[in-house]
Amino acid sequence: MPFLGQDWRSPGWSWIKTEDGWKRCESCSQKLERENNRCNISHSIILNSEDGEIFNNEEHEYASKKRKKDHFRNDTNTQSFYREKWIYVHKESTKERHGYCTLGEAFNRLDFSSAIQDIRRFNYVVKLLQLIAKSQLTSLSGVAQKNYFNILDKIVQKVLDDHHNPRLIKDLLQDLSSTLCILIRGVGKSVLVGNINIWICRLETILAWQQQLQDLQMTKQVNNGLTLSDLPLHMLNNILYRFSDGWDIITLGQVTPTLYMLSEDRQLWKKLCQYHFAEKQFCRHLILSEKGHIEWKLMYFALQKHYPAKEQYGDTLHFCRHCSILFWKDYHLALLFKDSGHPCTAADPDSCFTPVSPQHFIDLFKF
């Protein structure tokens, strides 16, 4: 018969019925504490001064380790990642499994922290964070929000260190700051998990990141080896044709006059439009020059405002339709050990795998 004390978090007292009536039974922790006290008394009697000094040093070392451990647990920058390569996605309760998997739980358990270090997965994770910032930020739990901003911090530091794709991160931070401004202004109307002061501090951090990226300067590398300008024209042209983003083509065209000439090629922009958009969409947004030629470059940016461009990623999460498991697929392990990336029971696992786009990842957890 538990007795609930004044502190609602207390487990209360435990009582047991005996022949003489109800008696309070002591918990195991109290018994252990009493035994420890007895041991400490006996130790103080037995130990001499030299042994006592050693014993005190051990106690001091233990207390120091405990403080560090508590600090690690309470540190707001500490990440709560499981570092798992796969998770089971269940959308309803069953006899075997209670509850369901939420977006925040999936975000916590999948190893996004290591994924941003892989250049093939970097853009994928950034796009996923951007979609969460636009529409799913309020659906994340407190732990998931902390992990979200810790991953974002790692991404910003990575961009500041290696200058990899800063424009993509600027777009992400712009969307995130806009969402936070709206949520903070409408506090009380929107479901914003956590203290409002924490969110204001996070917004200030985002503004500081934006300023750091704005001040980012590309240092000129002093290298006597082969540079991009030394390559033949047909190789430079081949590089430009590999790009799937129009802004990347424009940015590269600003490096040298030769690259600018190649970046203005009408055929290049035509191929880019055909890759991202359908022919029916061309007809609705035709832009002609004074001579009657189609302005493919202007059409690309016009179509981009009306239709979503085709997304292309080096590596993505995969979903197994047979096992209902979401996982990262390690291609090196798959080639060497025929590892599917998760414990799959299908006869032909590869036929059950589906690449998961960032939007599909969000949709998986809409119940």
UniProtKB/Swiss-Prot annotation:
F-box domain: residues covered: 226-274
Region (Interaction with beta-actin): 1-83
InterPro entries reported for this sequence: F-box-like_dom_sf (IPR036047), FBX25/32 (IPR040394)
GO biological process: protein ubiquitination
Domain of life of the organism encoding this protein: Eukaryota
Quaternary structure (record): Part of a SCF (SKP1-cullin-F-box) protein ligase complex consisting of FBXO25, SKP1, CUL1 and RBX1. Interacts directly with SKP1 and CUL1. Interacts (via C-terminus) with beta-actin (via N-terminus).
Protein purpose: Substrate-recognition component of the SCF (SKP1-CUL1-F-box protein)-type E3 ubiquitin ligase complex. May play a role in accumulation of expanded polyglutamine (polyQ) protein huntingtin (HTT).
Protein name, entry field: F-box only protein 25
Species this chain originates from: Homo sapiens (Human)
UniProt lineage: Eukaryota, Metazoa, Chordata, Craniata, Vertebrata
